[in-house]
UniProtKB/Swiss-Prot annotation:
The gene is UTP25. It comes from Yarrowia lipolytica (strain CLIB 122 / E 150) (Yeast). This is U3 small nucleolar RNA-associated protein 25. Component of the ribosomal small subunit (SSU) processome composed of at least 40 protein subunits and snoRNA U3. The keyword Ribonucleoprotein applies. Belongs to the UTP25 family. One of its GO terms (biological process) is maturation of SSU-rRNA from tricistronic rRNA transcript (SSU-rRNA, 5.8S rRNA, LSU-rRNA).
Length: 641
């Protein structure tokens, strides 16, 4: 029977208006009341979403010959065991998941973390690699051994090894740098703006997931065969701890159906399967031909091509020779889901009906295209991760005599590997990654940035002004006060502010500025991710023609539409964009006006406010070297050309 969940969803594109601390703005009573005066933007409306609305949910339990499946898996396990028995094979799976209980409990309870970092190059890209380890974990895992072991010496199932070689070819420089951390089950955050590097990373992750799932299934089947033989021979003193509470071992979070489809193709290729069950149904629901206009930036084309539906939750069963889409969740090995789809299924605190037991035994959680999911709703991601590795409410046929000890000890989250793939690391991504507690440790790889100051192709005056904020919570009001006093009031007094584009990251920040400017009777327009297409066109035209002197423009609208705004003579940045490409594109608005002859180059100017809490975004814009100086210096303003 379909279950319904009440969620808040805008009429057009769902965006997060509550996920960040900036959402506190909307709780200011006077501002909320005045926001109601304007009806240009389409406010969020409540819609009833049912389980049947989620692609892939509601699948019934399948009638399968489990004994036949187990026999096939056990046969495969015996064949693969011969390959595993080679004395020079390195097996991080065994080191991680079969660690001695007394030792891993001691290491985990110590909670003594140490961090080290190094600067190196991956290919031609300078990077910083940060390693975080538990003090005594090396006695169990010896990560240094993983780092010096050749990829060919790792234990990988022959079919997967062959499939990955056919899909990928020889390891690339990116993959060589990453595989020791990935295959040693360390938490891993990899940030790169290179689409080719992202693809190489994704192929390696697909292989790792396939290896983990097939290895786990074969181990369970092989041990079941042994137990049956022992029972026939009257032997009952042998036990195997090889299972979780429920069957799914891997969670893959992706922003859209197209992203799911593309990663699934990598998984199929890397696993080397011969058969795809329900392939036609999957292709029809997830694949959509057609590309985004090639006039849009490359990263936009990647994010929004194909099927952009963000409401799905799909169970996938993977075996050595076959893959089955639309598997019943409690019979699936992998759960592919959008944050919105899975959050709707999981429910929220206080809901009468919630379903998250199938997330209780996740051993790998992979966040794919994470920055895109941030723009959708980070709250959904946090909710889903928060419901992972909890004790299930029902047994679901679990054989508790075979549940791994770390599940019974309540330590599942300490064994789960979290993998994050992103273009750039934001404070929200940092927060999630910093709070993972995998006892194998974690590795974070981030670029060393040159910055975006000179990308515009001509010299543009760029001014960065620091303001003080005592804390993250104080930053909200401190930023608004600084913006009004330092930027807005001076601009209005001068009387020369026609053609000013004010960039704000989100709708809630736009609301506060909009209400203030309403009170001061300032001529302006405002467009956001909630604006109708008609309103966007109208305000862009009025701004271009000078009939609205100021245009408030949100980063989320830019993310979803990537408009090229004309008539810009000055750019004012309320809060730095996390995506450095946005900053570059804001500068291009100015250079276009110069090229059009409507703006003197000497008059083109971009002004931005920043605080110590903006240093990650600032680093990507001014460069790694400059941001260190700006962070330590006592100066309040910095100017670049």
């Amino acid at each position: 029977m379909a279950r319904s969940h009440k969620v808040t969803k805008p009429k057009r594109q769902q965006v997060d208006t509550s996920g960040s601390y900036n959402a506190l703005m909307v709780l200011m009573g006077d501002n909320v009341k005045k926001a109601e005066k304007r009806v240009e933007e389409e406010e969020p409306v409540e819609q009833e979403l049912e389980e049947d609305d989620i692609e892939g949910a509601g699948e019934e339990e399948e009638e399968v010959d489990e004994e036949q499946e187990e026999e096939e898996d056990a046969d495969d396990a015996e064949e693969d065991a011969e390959d595993d028995s080679e004395t020079d094979k390195y097996d991080p799976y065994k080191l991680h998941f079969e660690a001695e209980e007394a030792k891993y409990v001691s290491v985990i309870k110590s909670e003594e973390w140490k961090t080290s970092s190094e600067k190196t190059k991956i290919g031609s890209q300078p990077v910083r690699i940060t390693y975080t380890n538990l003090e005594d974990a090396d006695e169990l895992l010896d990560f240094s051994e993983a780092q010096k072991t050749e990829f060919s010496k790792y234990t990988v199932r022959p079919r997967i090894k062959d499939g990955f070689k056919q899909l990928n070819g020889s390891l690339t420089s990116v993959q060589k740098a990453i595989y020791p951390s990935l295959m040693a089950y360390r938490d891993l955050c990899y940030a790169t703006s290179s689409l080719s590097d992202t693809e190489e990373f994704s192929r390696l992750v697909a292989m790792h997931i396939a290896q983990h799932v097939v290895r786990t299934a074969e181990e369970v089947a092989y041990n079941t065969r042994i137990l049956k033989r022992n029972a026939e021979e009257g032997i009952h003193d042998v036990e195997f701890r090889d299972q979780g509470y429920t069957k799914p071992r891997v969670l893959v979070l992706v922003p859209t159906k197209n992203a799911c489809f593309e990663f699934m193709q990598l998984l199929v290729g890397a696993s080397g399967v011969d058969r795809e069950d329900n392939k036609a149904r999957f292709n029809k629901a997830f694949h959509e031909a057609g590309a985004v206009l090639d006039t849009k930036p490359e990263d936009f084309q990647k994010a929004f091509k194909g099927n952009t539906d963000d409401m799905f939750c799909l169970g996938v069963k993977l075996r050595n020779k076959s893959i089955r889409y639309y598997s019943y969740f409690y019979q699936a090995d992998i759960v592919f889901a959008s944050p919105l789809g899975l959050k709707t299924l999981v429910g929220s605190e206080g809901d009468s009906k919630r379903e998250f037991d199938f997330l209780s035994s996740i051993e790998i959680a992979y966040l794919h295209e994470t920055n895109h999911m941030e723009m959708q709703s980070w709250d959904n991601v946090l909710t889903v991760l928060g419901q992972t590795n909890l004790l299930p409410n029902e047994s679901h046929g679990c054989d508790f005599s075979r549940v791994k000890s770390f599940y019974l000890d309540g330590l599942a989250k300490h064994f789960r590997q979290t993998i994050v793939a992103c273009q750039f690391v934001t404070p929200t991504i940092n927060s999630v990654f910093s709070n993972t507690v995998n006892f194998a440790g974690k590795t974070k790889i981030t670029p060393i940035y040159n910055g975006e100051l000179a990308v515009a192709g001509m010299k543009i005056r760029q001014i960065f002004t620091r303001f003080k904020a005592l804390s993250v919570s104080d930053e909200i009001d401190a930023r608004f006060k600084a913006f009004v006093q330092i930027t807005l009031e001076g601009m209005i007094r001068s009387g020369d502010y026609s053609g000013t584009l004010i960039y704000v990251p989100t709708y809630v920040e736009l609301v506060r500025l909009r209400n203030y400017m309403d009170e001061k009777n300032i001529s302006f327009g405002a467009i956001s991710e909630y604006s109708s297409i008609t309103e966007v066109k109208r305000h862009r035209t009025l701004f271009r023609d000078g009939r609205e002197k100021i245009l408030l423009y949100t980063g989320r609208l830019h993310h979803y539409r990537r408009y090229f705004v004309k008539g810009v003579k000055s750019v004012v940045i309320y809060k730095l964009p996390e995506n450095p490409a946005f900053y570059r594109e804001l500068l291009l608005f100015l250079t276009h006006s110069v090229d059009e002859g409507t703006l003197e180059q000497s008059m083109a100017k971009c002004r931005a406010l920043f605080t110590i809490y903006d240093l990650l975004a600032l680093e990507r814009i001014v460069g790694t070297k400059r941001v260190k100086t700006m962070a330590k210096s006592g100066e309040s303003s910095y100017e670049f050309y």
